[in-house]
Swiss-Prot record:
The keyword Transmembrane applies. PANTHER family: TRANSMEMBRANE PROTEIN 144. One of its GO terms (molecular function) is carbohydrate transmembrane transporter activity. Belongs to the GRP transporter (TC 2.A.7.5) family. Involved in the uptake of glucose. This is Probable glucose uptake protein GlcU. CDD domains: glucose_uptake_GlcU.
Length: 285
């Protein structure tokens, strides 16, 4: 039962972008709707959990949420250019590299020889995985498609910065996840509005995309529940499995076309990235 709870965040988070794309509306309406969904869920959780909200918790939570919105909005922009099945493995890989290097440099996480070896191997696996999942078909090598890929990668780098700050600012100030949940959601909504209001995102698609926001917040809740039961290392490793759902879902559910060579690269690349996530989880423990 505990392992099942620990897998739920991966299932929920892995399906979010599939819902975003299926529900439609483009990256701006998708971002805004998702943030409002997260806020609704967080208000309900706050009513039942009643965590203590200090000025530090509120401030840190809002900043974290603002940067989450930056990460999510740019990830959805990249999906608009490159598709789910290409964007998500690269995005996951970049996030793992960024959070790992920050953890090593700032928090000195790799304190033993084994953790250093596992960490370095994990980073190598991530690089290999990202390269394999980025393979282009001959058709995609034309000027327009190549331009979309380059723009998509640049946008993903911005997205990675957003997701990195979203994660590490909570840890830097040692804020409890349950306490940060509501302020975080407020920051997400503020960030979503600031990043999208020029593009007139307030439409029926924004309302539809409240659903992915509810799903994201539910995944967050199950992560908080599972961590004390299975440990941070195991829950972190299992949460990376969402890449399987999002990537294969992009191909099988959204109908993104891939050549046999690309499919092979994606499957093998996912294996490398998941292996890296597991190794990083062990290195953290």
């Amino acid at each position: 039962m505990d392992i099942f709870l620990a897998i739920l965040p991966a299932i929920f988070w892995g399906s979010i972008v599939l819902f975003n794309v299926k529900l439609g509306g483009g990256p701006y309406s998708q971002t805004l709707g998702t943030t409002f969904g997260a806020l609704i869920f967080s208000i309900v959780v706050y009513i039942f959990m009643k965590p203590v909200l200090t000025p530090t918790v509120i401030g840190v939570g809002i900043v974290s949420g603002l940067f989450w919105a930056l990460g999510q909005a740019n990830q959805l922009k990249s999906i608009d250019l490159m598709g789910v099945s290409r964007t998500m493995p690269i995005s996951t890989g970049l996030q793992l590299v960024a959070t790992t290097l920050f953890g090593v440099i700032v928090f000195h996480e790799w304190s033993t020889t084994i953790s250093v070896v596992l960490g370095v191997l994990a980073l190598v696996c991530i690089i290999i995985g990202v390269i394999l999942t980025s393979l282009q078909s001959e058709e995609e090598k034309n000027a327009e498609q190549a331009g979309n890929f380059k723009r998509g990668i640049i946008i993903l780098l911005i997205s990675t910065v957003g997701y990195l700050v979203y994660v590490v600012v909570i840890r830097l100030f040692n804020v409890d996840g349950w306490s940060a949940l509501l302020p975080q959601a407020v920051g997400m909504v503020l960030g979503g509005i600031l990043l999208t209001f020029k593009h007139h995102p307030f439409n029926k698609y924004a309302i539809r995309n409240i659903i992915p926001g509810l799903i994201w917040a539910a995944g967050n809740m199950f992560l908080f529940i599972s961590q004390p039961r299975v440990g941070v290392a195991t829950s972190f490793s299992l949460s990376q499995m969402g890449i399987i759902i999002s990537t294969l879902g992009g191909i099988l559910i959204l109908g993104e076309r891939k050549t046999k060579r690309q499919l092979t690269g994606i499957v093998v690349g996912i294996v490398f990235i998941i292996a890296a996530g597991i190794m990083l989880g062990i290195a953290k423990s």
